[in-house]
Amino acid sequence: MADGEGGWWGGWLTQSFQSVKDKSAEAYEFIKRDLTEFSSVVQHDTACSVVATANAIKSKLAVEGSSETTEKVKKGITNILGVITDTLAPPPDKTIDCDVITLVATPTGTTEVYDSGKARLYSLQADPATYCNEPDGPPQQFDSWLSTFSLEERKAEISELLVSSPAIRALYTKMVPAAVAHAEFWQRYFYKVFQLEQEEARRVALKQRAEQTDHSESLGWEEEDEEGEFLGATSLSRLDFTPPVEESRVPAVTVADTPESSSPPQAVASLSNVASDVTPSVSSDSVSFPTQIENQAESVTIRVTQPSPAADELSQKLSDTGLQETFPEERPAPREETAREDMAQDLRVFELNSDSGKSTPSNNGKKGSSTDVSEDWEKDFDLDMTEEEVQMALSKVDATEELEDEDWENWE
């Protein structure tokens, strides 16, 4: 897990660093472009101001009459202003589209505007080290170039250089043959020119590549912005829906112990969230289940009553005589009201719809009376016993209850 988190952090840091680097490069290019434009504007404004001033002075000097001395001074000032004007604002036919403009003075007293390549060539021609020192770079490269160089083929060019370039002519007259030989002089010169042309070609290629890169990056940023806007406009929100899980219905059972004098121990179980249509089940023969089922409620209460020993004896007697128990038809929703007499606890019967002390609602929704309950009780059970047997069973029950009351009082 740690390795996964480290990889994630490393990838995130790498992406962040790359994004910051790209943004910084873009900002640098913008600043560089702004500075270039600013310098161009300042240079143009300055040139315009100087030209306007020179033209104003020329006009003023032309209007005013002067003596011969004044004419000389005026001519000198006019020449100076003309040089400045031609330098800062050259005519269209002499304008060179380049990054660097160099003003070079000629032996005739005039000036020429050179670009960076021409300026370096002029500097190379006027430098004595070009002819005296060994060529720069690896010797193998110089030997390779020398194998393709022919001095005889350059005679016309050499003659033109000696005529048109006073610097080369002066250095050639001074050095050949005192310092260097004629062949070495021109070999070193043309090799320097060859290296200068290579550097110029590399510079132009780099410039074009930088311009193409800037153009492609600007197009890439525009495409990314448009794509981001399109995706942001058409993206759909995702809704994670989790269906509700039905909670398990767990019955909660509560056991309540009451003194034997009032009622036997009872266990009450409450079942929540149960459907209203519940069919009670029949339990063991030794337990009586008064069950309350409410149709509109969401709970079922089951009360378990422990029988007395007399009830067990009476139950055994009833089973010997072949008592047949008849279950009444299930009623929708009986309701518990009061406790029935002690005899209802002793008779071990299965009650599904009504308790001894509860009124049973009829089919039309009205509550029944205790008389109806007694009649239903008599109809449900037909005891095949004599009157003497019933009296004997009741006397045993009374005796048992008296003994239990005495035991309870003695225990207290």
UniProtKB/Swiss-Prot annotation:
Q: Where is the composition biased (Basic and acidic residues)?
A: 208-217, 328-349
Question: Phosphoserine (modified residue): where?
Answer: 308
* Phosphoprotein listed as a keyword: yes
Instruction: List residues of the BSD domain.
Output: 145-197
Respond yes or no to whether keyword Glycoprotein is given for this record.
no
Keyword annotations for this protein, in alphabetical order, are: Phosphoprotein
Enumerate the residue ranges of region (Disordered): 208-227, 253-272, 298-412
Which Pfam families does the UniProt record give? BSD (PF03909)
* Skewed-composition ranges (Acidic residues): 373-390, 400-412
Q: Which GO terms describe its cellular component?
A: cytoplasm
- Report the domain of life of the source organism: Eukaryota
The Polar residues compositionally biased stretches are: 259-272, 298-308, 353-372
Protein name per its UniProtKB record: BSD domain-containing protein 1
